[in-house]
């Protein structure tokens, strides 16, 4: 039995284990992270060059072909360490969810929900 498990581990690509690691970490980060108030969760991408998405808040989980550029707006939902869980909505309505490094994001001071406290 041990030889069989060793053979499977040898034949499985390392990406399979990385994907499982990233999936577990993303779930944990969503559960343990700090949630944003939807009245103040819209950010713009700042800096220069591409801001890559990650499938989880870890360098090992980079999505090399998924990125946004300066000026794009993101909706932040959870903060975990150096990352925000975000959604990007493209001009044609496609949505991309994932994690980005928060140091490239610039606050806009508005959100996707009305702030009823300021309307009193």
What residue spans do the PLM features occupy?
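Short aromatic-glycine-enriched beta-strand elements
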Residues: 81-85
């Amino acid at each position: 039995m041990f030889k069989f498990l060793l053979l499977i581990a040898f034949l499985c690509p390392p990406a399979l284990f990385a994907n499982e690691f990233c999936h577990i970490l993303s779930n944990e980060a969503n559960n343990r992270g700090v949630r944003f108030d939807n009245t103040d969760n819209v950010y713009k991408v700042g800096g220069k060059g591409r801001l890559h998405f990650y499938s989880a808040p870890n360098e090992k989980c980079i999505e090399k072909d998924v990125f946004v550029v300066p000026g794009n707006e993101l909706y932040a939902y959870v903060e975990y360490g150096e990352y925000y869980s975000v959604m990007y909505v493209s001009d044609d309505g496609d949505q991309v969810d994932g994690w980005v490094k928060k140091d490239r994001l610039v606050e806009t001071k508005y959100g996707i929900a009305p702030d009823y406290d300021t309307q009193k």
